[in-house]
């Protein structure tokens, strides 16, 4: 058997019969041989490696996304390198440079924080520069660019639907709890505001409540505002919604009889609290699946891949609402 044939088997070429492939793999297994991926990458001009970035791996949403991405990429024969960048622009830029230095085939960035503030171009310039070296895929964020692709939850429509449902149940003072002004958070706020306006309700600044996404911190901050009056809560994260439930418990407010609460992301928190939380499922699994499918298509030379895919959300109704 020639060296070229063995090389084709090791590198995953389809131009080898199954019988020959099995013979080579049997010898590799018997000898305990491990291919040098760096040498193989130089020969194939591909490391079969995807870089994945997120701001915080401890976040449940991020962890779920990473798990789904890694599993799906593995099925296509790709390995993954993970970088946790934090939220500062300098740290993000440094992680992008680090991953690109590993000769990754593509870069996946999870979370709205990578979309910048939507106003200043310099916030996302490093991503556009990175896309000149490798395809960039954003999950739940949006940047326009020739070699940049995005999969987004339809946060605007989900927020509009939640707010409208609360209004139909007679709610008039809907507190919007948020922790950032990322692309996703802005889409949710715009959906909330549009639903209020369409129903003829005023959009009140005192009902937009900004806090950290930390349960006890958010609860205590809400308690500190003595004149805060609301009959329902729509939170952009499940953790913030749980904070609202804890606020209600301290104040002796019954849920959902006196106060309706809706969270976001349908995380394990939504079924770990009492009462169980109505939450919007942003379908991160579907977003990741779409991202992987599109990445593979782009890397295979497909030029007709959509630069933006919108994934509809689902409201999972539980015990904190009566709609």
Cite the ranges covered by each PLM segment:
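Helix N-cap/beta->alpha junction signal
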Residues: 155, 185, 237-238
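Alpha-helical recognition/docking segments in bacterial nutrient-uptake
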Residues: 45-164, 224-227
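An alpha-beta-alpha
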Residues: 160-201, 206, 307-322
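Short beta-strand elements in bilobed, periplasmic/extracellular small-molecule ligand-binding domains
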Residues: 73-84, 176, 193-215
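Flexible loop/turn connectors
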Residues: 219-323
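N-terminal helix-turn-helix DNA-binding module of bacterial transcription factors
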Residues: 1-48
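Hydrophobic alpha-helical segments within soluble ligand-binding/sensing domains
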Residues: 147-176, 194, 214-224, 241, ...
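Periplasmic-binding protein-like
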Residues: 104-113, 137, 175-177, 226-239, ...
């Amino acid at each position: 058997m020639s060296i070229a044939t063995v090389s084709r088997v090791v590198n995953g070429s389809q131009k080898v019969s199954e019988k020959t492939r099995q013979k080579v793999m049997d010898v590799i297994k018997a000898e305990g041989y491990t291919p040098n991926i760096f040498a193989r990458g130089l020969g194939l001009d591909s490391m079969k490696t995807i870089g994945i970035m997120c701001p915080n791996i401890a976040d449940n949403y991020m962890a779920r996304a990473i798990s789904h991405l890694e599993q799906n990429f593995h099925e296509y024969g790709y390995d993954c390198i993970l970088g946790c960048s934090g939220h500062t622009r300098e740290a993000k830029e440094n992680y992008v440079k680090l991953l690109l230095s590993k000769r990754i085939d593509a870069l996946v960035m999870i979370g709205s924080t990578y979309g910048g503030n939507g106003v200043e171009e310099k916030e996302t310039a490093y991503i556009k520069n990175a896309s000149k070296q490798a395809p960039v895929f954003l999950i739940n964020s949006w940047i326009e660019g020739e070699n940049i692709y995005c999969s987004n939850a339809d946060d605007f429509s989900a927020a509009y639907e939640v707010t409208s449902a609360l209004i139909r149940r007679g709610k008039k003072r809907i507190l919007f709890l948020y922790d950032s002004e990322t692309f996703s958070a802005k889409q949710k706020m715009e959906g909330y505001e549009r639903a209020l306006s369409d129903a003829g309700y005023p959009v009140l600044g005192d009902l937009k409540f900004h806090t950290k996404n930390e349960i006890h911190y958010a609860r205590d901050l809400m308690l500190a505002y003595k004149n805060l009056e609301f009959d329902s809560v729509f939170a952009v994260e499940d953790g913030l919604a749980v904070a609202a439930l804890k606020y209600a418990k301290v104040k002796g407010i019954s849920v959902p009889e006196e106060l309706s609460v809706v969270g976001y992301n349908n995380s394990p928190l939504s079924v770990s609290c009492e009462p169980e939380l109505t939450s919007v499922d942003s379908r991160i699994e579907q977003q990741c699946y779409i991202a992987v499918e599109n990445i593979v298509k782009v890397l295979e030379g497909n030029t007709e891949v959509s630069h933006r895919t919108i994934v509809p959300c689902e409201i999972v109704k539980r015990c904190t609402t009566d709609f």
